[in-house]
Amino acid sequence: MSATLEKTSWWQHSALKWLAVSLCVLFTGYLVVLMYSQGEYLFAMVTLVLLGMGIYVFSNRNTYAWRYTYPGVAGMGLFVLFPLICTIAIAFTNYSSINQLTFERAQSVLMSRQYQSGQALTFKLYPKSDLWVLALSIPSQTKQLVSEPFSLSAMEETTLHVYEQDNLENGEAATLRIITQNRQALNQLVVVLPDGNRLKMSSLRQFSGVHPQYSLGEDGESLTDNQTGTLYRPNTDTGFYQSVNAEGTWGNETLTPGFTVTIGWKNFLRVIQDEGIQKPFLAIFVWTVVFSLFTVVLTVAVGMVLACIVQWEALKGRAVYRVLLILPYAVPSFISILIFKGLFNQSFGEINLLLNGLFGLKPAWFTDPTMARTMLIVVNAWLGYPYMMILCMGLLKAIPDDLYEASAMDGAGPFQNFFKITFPLLIKPLTPLMIASFAFNFNNFVLIQLLTLGGPDRIGTTTPAGYTDLLVSYTYRIAFDGSSGQDFGLAAAIATVIFLLVGALAVINLKATRIKFD
């Protein structure tokens, strides 16, 4: 027997594989160390776990089958499960625009604050060779306090002594433009007066006495206001430094920025107990369900009727009508939404111009809640009916012609055929798709954001809420558009509720399609 030697390609060599794995490990390891050094421990841990699992799967011959499923599983974990877990975790904290720092960082920010005291002295800068001389003017005196020549290139804090001088500095002083350009360097100067007082730059024209606003207590946590003597302690229930009364009880004054703390179920209880949140939340929830339901019913009805029409063999030019009716589905939705926003313009839109010319009507599409909601449903039906029409066109092909021939022999007309044969045979396979469409429109953020921005706004609410807001857009406005600050914790709590609602819809969808779990 002659042995046959198989030649291995260069890219199949094991050394190349291990070289690629080594480079991947080094690069990802560098990213992990970088994230860990920046304090992003969770991201570093997730990256490390995914890297370790990936190396194990792709380097072990016993896990060969997992090589095909691991990318999908890793992607689902990274882009679905990880954000979901983070959102749920944030829902149990007070994380917001004023409570997004750690306790140590918030304390450091407060300790860096300063206040001005004493007399402010006007200053001028005079060039001297490649250096500069600082001259401070003493009010009601002809004397000046002049420094030794110094450089503005130093970026670290520099102590600068000044001395009295009878003769005023001659020469042209630096312009405001030069001072502005060197403001960062001037802010690093600590001017020491002959009496020992220290001054720092307080404006583009003055140096004044600056002192720390707060001093740290012996316990390493409490702060004392050096101006008022007020004592502040960290309140771990609210996430703020809060004033303490003489009796040792909490006062009403708090310091910002605050810090992030775990508050348990308080965000969820706010949705239930706070009337300023409860009322708009319940109203928006009802409107979200109504909007999704009306959209599904309208798109299915229009799509089914149009599908029956374009499939009618006696209709001439069916192919042309079919293409024209599918065109709205081919245009990107955000373009169609912006076009409709112009068409529905209350002052210059073509729709109002037409209605005003024919009937003398000019509906307030964007300021009247009822008209705004009607506009949303109409626009969404326009965007969604082509999808349902395509589905119905395919399902109509599966209906046997014998049924229509038998009904014709019994003397049935088009309407009887539709309601007795077509509709019952179409609605059953459409049910799971209708549930999926309902779930999609439940979170139809793009339509609301581009067309109405949730408006018109509701009056008397503690959170930004509008009459056309869906739960998802309401959550977005709480997280990013709140006038009193961005409340990420409350938004995450509402997002968690939305997740549970959509999850319930998914379960209903699975039951409707008769998928059983072991």
Swiss-Prot record:
Task: Tell me where in this chain the ABC transmembrane type-1 domain is found.
Answer: 285-509
Localization (cell)? Cell inner membrane
Say if the entry is tagged with keyword Transmembrane helix: yes
Q: Give the primary localization class.
A: membrane
The UniProt entry, under PANTHER family, shows: MALTOSE/MALTODEXTRIN TRANSPORT SYSTEM PERMEASE PROTEIN MALF, MALTOSE_MALTODEXTRIN TRANSPORT SYSTEM PERMEASE PROTEIN MALF
Task: Give the function comment from the record.
Answer: Part of the ABC transporter complex MalEFGK involved in maltose/maltodextrin import. Probably responsible for the translocation of the substrate across the membrane.
Record-given protein name: Maltose/maltodextrin transport system permease protein MalF
The organism of origin for this protein: Photorhabdus laumondii subsp. laumondii (strain DSM 15139 / CIP 105565 / TT01) (Photorhabdus luminescens subsp. laumondii)
